[in-house]
Amino acid sequence: MKILFLIILTAFFIGVHCKHGYPIIRAGRDKGCKVSCVINNQYCDTECKQLKGRRGYCYFWRLACFCEYLPDYVPTWSRATNKCKAK
């Protein structure tokens, strides 16, 4: 019973320290912009897994990769802190 409680407690804390969002490009001309895609879930899934996310997919309406269960330290795009200057 104690082991089951410990597993559930651990799963809870892991879930608390994860987030979902659009990963951003960290260097170059497009720094601060979302990672773009055009209906290519495999590309986005690979990008998200490299960032230690659980899965990723191409969000068609935004033409950008969306990642689920990213660690908190991975920067994600936010409208409030948008620094993308790509044209």
Swiss-Prot record:
Keyword Transcription assigned: no
Localization annotation: Secreted
Signal peptide start-end: 1-18
GO function terms (MF aspect): sodium channel inhibitor activity; toxin activity
Every LCN-type CS-alpha/beta domain range: 19-85
GO CC annotation: extracellular region
Superkingdom of this protein's organism: Eukaryota
A single BP term in Gene Ontology: defense response
InterPro entries in the cross-refs: LCN-type_CS_alpha_beta_dom, Scorpion_toxin-like, Scorpion_toxin-like_sf, Scorpion_toxinL, Scorpion_toxinL/defensin
Residues recorded with modification Cysteine amide: 84
Primary localisation category: secreted
SS bonds (residue pairs): 33-84, 37-58, 44-65, 48-67
Keywords of this entry: Amidation, Disulfide bond, Ion channel impairing toxin, Neurotoxin, Secreted, Signal, Toxin, Voltage-gated sodium channel impairing toxin
Keyword Secreted found: yes
Tissue: Expressed by the venom gland.
Physiological role: Binds voltage-independently at site-4 of sodium channels (Nav) and shift the voltage of activation toward more negative potentials thereby affecting sodium channel activation and promoting spontaneous and repetitive firing.
Domain notes: Has the structural arrangement of an alpha-helix connected to antiparallel beta-sheets by disulfide bonds (CS-alpha/beta).
Family per similarity comment: Belongs to the long (4 C-C) scorpion toxin superfamily. Sodium channel inhibitor family. Beta subfamily.
Name of this protein: Neurotoxin LmNaTx64.1
Natural source organism: Lychas mucronatus (Chinese swimming scorpion)
